[in-house]
Amino acid sequence: MKIQSMFQKDINRDINGVIKVSQDDQQSLKQELSEYIITKELRRHFATFFDNYVKAIDNPTDKIGVWISGFFGSGKSHFLKMLSYLLSNKEVDGKHAFDYFADKFDDPMMYATVQKCVRIPTESILFNIDIEGPINKDKTAVLRVFAKVFYNHCGFYGEDLKVAKLERFIDKQGKT
């Protein structure tokens, strides 16, 4: 018996060593979702996130935010990408993100919490701030990047915030 025959999946398949936000083809997403492993530490982070998220669902607030930090290569982008897929319950290969995670949450309470969260219609906007951001960085650079990406997501011209705001105003007037 060869060691490689002991594995459920082909060990010679392509495995992407670096998770990229922009890599969103169905095959890559399916592999990421199906092969994502929730370690003890990740379980704790998912629990913290979703416990607080469900509190904001039960008691709406504008005082919610998330800060994800860690060393290079520690899995921040991968974790964030999985959160994004779960929150939007993205459909990949005919299966929703939550369904890929159904057997990954071994705690029934956490499973129920995540399930409650994914039932709320949510849009997530994933982007790499280094790619979207301006070369000249000043005090408002991060804010401008967020606004640009948001307006682009809404279908407006986010490259020029004045134009995007005008488009949004016209859209709200129902004149588009």
Which ranges hold each PLM region?
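Active-site-adjacent bridging/hinge elements
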Residues: N16-Q27, H45-N59, T113-E123
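P-loop NTPase motor core
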Residues: V66-F71, L80-T176
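Conserved lysine of the Walker
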Residues: K76
